[in-house]
Amino acid sequence: MIQAILVAFGGAIGSVLRYYVGQWALRLMGSAFPWGTLAVNVVGCFVIGVFAELIARKFDASVELRLLLITGFLGGFTTFSAFSLDAISLFERGEAVAGGIYIAASVGLSMAAVIAGLAVMRALA
């Protein structure tokens, strides 16, 4: 139960921070391009790289700290960071084909799922 609470707590903080970054980007850059989403995804990817190296590899941090910061905080801030870490991990293990398939499938199927979701809801409207 404590693990779920840690994920929820980290996720709440990450989600609120994502909201503020999005609002900041909207005020700074305007709404013609999704600058907020781009910023969160890039920053989240950098931070998950830092966390993965420091927490998981250098300091052998507890499962609870990993759940709080990586699954919770970064999961709430951006799930794109988890996708990116998974892809890089495949390449680092020498599984380039699997990494390429994972990237193509993740992007392609995710875009297709959004299109399908939009189509279903538009058909029901």
Curated annotation (Swiss-Prot):
Taxonomy of the source species: Bacteria, Pseudomonadati, Pseudomonadota, Alphaproteobacteria, Hyphomicrobiales
Annotated transmembrane regions: 1-21, 32-52, 68-88, 101-121
Catalysed transformations (reactions): fluoride(in) = fluoride(out)
Membrane topology: Multi-pass membrane protein
The protein's name in its UniProt record: Fluoride-specific ion channel FluC
Organism: Rhizobium johnstonii (strain DSM 114642 / LMG 32736 / 3841)
Gene name in the database record: fluC
Principal subcellular localisation of the protein: membrane
Function, in words: Fluoride-specific ion channel. Important for reducing fluoride concentration in the cell, thus reducing its toxicity.
Single GO MF descriptor: fluoride channel activity
Family: Belongs to the fluoride channel Fluc/FEX (TC 1.A.43) family.
One GO BP annotation of this record: cellular detoxification of fluoride
Location(s), subcellular: Cell inner membrane
GO cellular component: plasma membrane
Binding, Na(+): 75, 78
Known regulation of activity: Na(+) is not transported, but it plays an essential structural role and its presence is essential for fluoride channel function.
Pfam family, one: CRCB
Keyword annotations of the record: Cell inner membrane, Cell membrane, Ion channel, Ion transport, Membrane, Metal-binding, Sodium, Transmembrane, Transmembrane helix, Transport
Superkingdom as given in the UniProt entry: Bacteria
